[in-house]
Amino acid sequence: MKRVVSIVLLLLLLPALPAAAPGTGAGGGLTVSAPSAVLMEKETGTVLFEKNARDTGFPASVTKIMTMLLIVEAIESGAVSPDDVVTASERAASFGGSCVYLEAGEQMSVHEMLKCIAVVSANDCAVAMAEHLCGSEEVFVRRMNERAKELGL
């Protein structure tokens, strides 16, 4: 399962690589097309490059990566099984944007929900899993923030 998550994460992050890799611009500086970026040296924490580093951005689907991590960790700990059935709530079914159009009461396995989150970036499945794992979206968000702190993010 860890290998699957690693592959999914790699596939999700691959589109960002061309934007960061073109090389140098005129004058020898790094050229980055992203609206903001920070490059730091791992050992010392020295900032090697920054562009709009203090700007606030929105996490978008990056939160789905944390959602998938918590799902996989719940599977590995035995808290849930990939075959467990998840029932979509009215709230989960009401989410738009990237979704698989779950209907309230619709049931899918944890494994299927995880695939929908990874492949489609399904908001409805992410909310259904949050509710399944933690009882509510709010408690799940707190758990994501705790886990992010544990990881030093």
Please name every model-derived segment.
Residues 1-6:
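N-terminal Sec-pathway targeting helices
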Residues 7-16:
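Bacterial N-terminal signal peptides
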Residues 19-153:
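Active-site-adjacent loops and short helices of periplasmic peptidoglycan-processing enzymes
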